[in-house]
From Swiss-Prot:
A Gene Ontology biological process term: allantoin catabolic process
Record-linked PANTHER family: ALLANTOICASE (PTHR12045), INACTIVE ALLANTOICASE-RELATED (PTHR12045:SF3)
Name of the featured protein: Probable allantoicase
Pfam families, per the entry: Allantoicase
Length: 336
């Protein structure tokens, strides 16, 4: 797995919200009017788009994205994407990386809420991204305003061409009110709405990988920092999906062998004021939820008796000593 590029110019919504069009969370491209040159599912690939000079297939130049044939009969192409979770869309990235003479001149996005089925000709769509001029080989970060949750998107390209990647950033909708208070939920799961607020280093792997479902597929699918050459330790701050009392923790070092974190600990707090930006300082003084624990390579570590009862918390600071990698972090808790 390639290390996703962290775009310093990307808007805040790309860091604050999960990508609801991520196939690792369950998103799928269900239909396209045409995919002659490149299949629709490639557009949702979580890895950055690549260009391979000289690579051709039976349909022509191989492109890393969704690409339709040249239209000669009017009209335009579209692709339907089922989101991983129903969610309120906050922003999108229409990425035309490596598409230069074959990108669509414009695109728009419609949305629908269909919790029990797939779109039909009778589906009522709502425009969430109006027709927008596109450039070749570029990211197009577009804010989306609204409070309605959606399950499906229709990506329209005018009239044809290719999109390398589609990212749909939004707040997952979870029915917490109807949830059983006696059941333990993974409050650090991205699919439930948890997100990374701040991280001191993610040179080799993104901290957000800690929150992904399933076990890591390889060493690149986890949080890994550079080699520390000075005193201190590495850390990240995570906002939980819902306030809760943490009862069980899993720290998984899958695939990390010569570079796993030597030890880890967790601090936690119930944050009632301030902003995400102020947590970096506050977190240094949070109470200890899990004292330092020695880790093993390529292993799932579980903790229950070791946890302090801090009551309901909203945020945790995950500390690695002194550096290294961890694949996944699970924080099972009872809802407040």
């Amino acid at each position: 797995m390639a290390m996703p590029t962290l775009d310093p110019n990307a808007p805040d919504f790309t860091r604050r919200y999960p990508n609801l069009a991520d196939p690792r969370l369950g998103a799928v491209a269900t239909f396209a009017t045409d995919e002659f040159f490149a299949p629709k599912d490639r557009m949702l690939n979580p890895e950055p788009a690549v260009f391979i000079p000289g690579k051709y297939d039976d349909h022509g130049k191989w492109m890393d994205g969704w690409e339709t044939r040249r239209r000669r009969n009017g009209g335009y192409d579209h692709c339907i994407v089922k989101l991983a979770r129903p969610g309120v869309v906050k922003g999108v990235d229409i990425d035309t990386s490596h598409f230069t003479g074959n990108f669509p001149p414009a695109a728009s996005i419609d949305a629908a809420y269909l919790p029990h089925g797939e779109p039909t000709d009778a589906t009522q769509w709502t425009e969430i991204v109006p027709s927008t001029t596109l450039q070749g080989n570029s990211h197009h970060y577009l804010d989306v305003f609204g409070t309605h949750a959606y399950t499906h998107l229709r990506v329209n390209i005018y009239p044809d061409g290719g999109i390398a990647r589609l990212r749909v950033y939004g707040q997952p909708q979870v029915d917490w009110k109807g949830a059983d208070r006696a059941t333990l939920f993974d409050l650090a799961a991205m699919e439930n709405g948890a997100y990374v607020v701040e991280v001191n280093n993610q040179h080799f792997g993104l901290a957000s990988s800690l929150l992904m479902p399933g076990r890591g597929i390889n060493m690149g699918d986890g949080w890994e920092t550079r080699r520390r050459r000075e005193p201190g330790n590495d850390w990240c701050i995570i906002a939980l999906a819902h306030p809760g009392r943490i009862r069980k923790i899993e720290v998984d070092t899958a695939h990390f062998k010569g570079n796993f974190a030597d030890r880890v600990s967790l601090q936690a707090a119930r944050v009632t004021g301030g902003t995400d930006a102020t947590l970096k300082t506050q977190a240094m003084f949070w109470q200890t939820l899990l004292p330092e624990q020695k880790l093993q390579m390529d292993h799932q570590h579980y903790y229950e008796a070791e946890l302090a009862d801090l009551g309901p918390v909203t945020h945790v600071r995950f500390n690695m000593f002194p550096d290294g990698g961890v694949s996944r972090l699970r924080l099972w808790g009872a809802l407040e």
